[in-house]
């Protein structure tokens, strides 16, 4: 079993640069459905999930994220996307059901695109677990 696993999109990749002790399974631009269809989750004591930023207009997002979360045995920290309110609501609902922790990147400085954290914000996120 892994100690720490970071999964998801480009935001997960950014966080992973500051947590070399964690296994990183992420891909720039991937949406939640494609992530679930592409990757197999190893067991981990802690899983950090950054998905939802690339899900705009995706049908069944809640079901995809709920099923993903249901496969995870250890504790979870969700990274709320800055740009997708539907994903934020779905993630908060799922996190509440499972008593997961949540980090809101809207509370940190974002880069000019309004989606990705700044370098300092990535560092701050990495220190939350």
Name every feature range the model reports, one short phrase each:
Residues 1-46:
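Serine-esterase "nucleophile elbow" of acetyl-processing enzymes
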Residues 21, 34-129:
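Alpha-helical cap/lid subdomain in secreted, periplasmic
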């Amino acid at each position: 079993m892994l100690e720490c696993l970071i999964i998801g999109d480009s935001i997960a990749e950014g966080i992973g640069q500051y947590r070399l002790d964690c296994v990183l399974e992420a891909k720039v631009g991937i949406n939640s459905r494609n992530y679930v269809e592409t990757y197999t989750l190893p067991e981990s004591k802690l899983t950090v999930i950054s998905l939802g930023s690339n899900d705009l207009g995706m049908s069944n997002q809640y079901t995809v994220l709920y099923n993903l979360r249901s496969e995870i045995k250890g504790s979870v920290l969700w990274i709320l996307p800055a740009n997708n309110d539907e994903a934020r609501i779905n993630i908060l609902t799922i996190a509440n059901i499972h008593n997961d922790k949540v980090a809101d990147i809207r509370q940190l400085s974002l880069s000019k695109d309004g989606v990705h954290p700044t370098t300092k914000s990535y560092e701050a996120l990495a220190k939350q677990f």
